[in-house]
Amino acid sequence: DEIFRTAVSTNHNVSVQGGLKNMPYRASVGFNNSNGIVKTSWMNRVNASLNLAPSLLDKHLNFNITSKFMYEKDRYADAGGAIGAALSMNPTQPVFGEGDQYAVTGGYYQNLINKSDAITDPNWKNTTNSNAAQNPVALLNQKEIMAHARDYSGNFEVDYKIHGFEDLHLHASLGAQYTSTQQSDEISKYSYSNNYFGWAGMTHYWKYNMIGNAYAQYAHKFGVHDIDVTAGAEQSHYHRHGYNQGFGTDDYLKENNPILNEETGYYNWQHNPSKRSEQEWANHNSLVSYFGRLNYNLLDRYLITTTFRADGSSRFKKGHKWGYFPSAAFAWKINHESFLKDVKWLDDLKLRLGWGKTGQQNGIDDFYYTPLYVVSNSYAQYPFGNDYHQTVRPSKYNDKLTWEKTTTWNAGIDFAALNNRFSFNI
């Protein structure tokens, strides 16, 4: 009862749809509010969307425009830690302690020991015992994790059926997404885990993606010949950028340690476990593709499909960027042959053959083909004189990486009879 509650969730949505002459539209707005079953956790979300589908030139020119927005705000609870602490802590102990010694825990009951740090604040004589179970209620209330997220996305599609040559149509689309997230972590200096030092951290993350493609498609039937041809290109870009920082909330150390350098103002905090940490990173990758497909149907008996795709990835070094992936498939509808067309109980008998190559580039880090040097962590430093300096080390790389290719073959038979009451596929 001290860490759990009955969760309540509300969800509201309003939508409007209609049409203005040749332009159907739909708009919607939604709001969601939820409380978690673990106390202190909750989530608020607002989302909106708009869709327009105008049609012009006697329905030869068609558009589809979509835009979406989402904003979400969360408070996360350390549910796993709180539940584990509740199972470990002596249930006969109170939530709040009695006595001045519990001032160092914000009044919450915790198992205390004498403080014996390398740098000791005389006003802080006790600290929490890391070998004892912590107070789960204190954990929930003294650790605050807040997150904000915004997401914008849009897609624009256009399709044009050529006047006087309606078997040919041109299609193009462009989509984009932008996401921004921010998370703040604050651990009280009265907490079990960061007693006295406390902790405050901030993480920012941004990403945006863009994907565009264009293709032409021609489909026509010439007597017993049915042809469908498609050719096009696609390009995509993915960008990521992140930043985080964290530091201890220990004003006493700042006020009572000598300054090493008057110009920089750096303090002698080499023994301070709450030293500030910062990290920033960014990466991106892109993909360029060209593709084509041919479908040929003769007499509705013999079907041939061939495809070809060429993909160029920024994840590989020059000379290894491109992969080429052909495929072919053949199907024979045997039950459409003259020697079987009078067999009334036979619904389907088809022979299938296929061959193709596919490529894989996922799971490979961006710029993995480039030798990079990485700055060491703050605790992996080298002493030089009175200062400590971070080191750099080369990261692993492979400039021979290229597309992982897989070749597949397949053959099969489809059979159905007695009005499809009996069927199988091999």
Describe the residue ranges of each PLM region:
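Outer-membrane beta-barrel translocator/receptor signature
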Residues: 1, 5-49, 58-61, 150-152
